[in-house]
């Protein structure tokens, strides 16, 4: 039996979004999280012997996304570096988009990674002098343990 107003049970905890934002900021500076699904955003002290943040797609059609606007500087090479992993009994689709254009698309699983962590590098230099909308998607592919684990997301300009 539930006591009190049913509406109160539907409201998210007041600081939940702030906690999610802090967890994402710790591993992906400048990024915000959208469309968070099962389990929310969970900061883990140790996953595969590394600190990590766990995400999950909102539903079968809506990926959980890490997003930010990025001014890509002229006269420098720019590189997006991602270190991510998968649930031991699942997999997920990693997509990297700039201005809604897919730059990288890969299944993250034991079969494709062959180790505990996937290292991805995406060259952003072609966007030099532009402000881009950058998105990293934890996209569902078969809806079995689609948890994404993020160790680090960095944008490097040299």
Labelled PLM ranges:
Residues 2-158:
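Gly-Asp-aromatic-enriched flexible segments
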